[in-house]
């Protein structure tokens, strides 16, 4: 392990979950494990037949939190939600390491799905077998479940769309 990379708090199938990203690294992605009425919300991209946790690339002017709020709305239609950070994750493939931020959310109010690349939002009791990223998503989901069991959402801040910089906790 490189000296400036924090020790992972969880490791599974090439995915490492860290408390923080190493100095000088930026989380390029925000992924959100979302609960609604006791189930997990997953999304299906219009070009795929598989399911995934909501999330996506961070815009250049966004924080990981702002990206998570935007992606949560764009991909699930969530208008009001509780949201907390679970940590950062790294994925190394082909010698390249990319970093992302993992969040846990509880959707309180959802509206219509905005026009986007998402074809379907569906509630699952557990992760389905047909995942878009089968080596990454289970590790992220396991970490989010651990945070959920520890009560992470109980005192998590309440957000509403749109989230602006002045609303960040």
Which sequence ranges carry the predicted segments?
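Acidic, metal-coordinating catalytic segment for phosphate/diphosphate chemistry
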Residues: 1-31
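Unchanged
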Residues: 58-81, 89-142, 168
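Active-site beta-strand termini and strand-to-loop segments that position acidic
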Residues: 34-37, 105-107
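Conserved Nudix-box catalytic region and its N-terminal flanking loop in Nudix hydrolases
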Residues: 35-74
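Charged phosphate-binding loop/patch that engages nucleotide di/tri-phosphates or the phosphate backbone
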Residues: 131-169
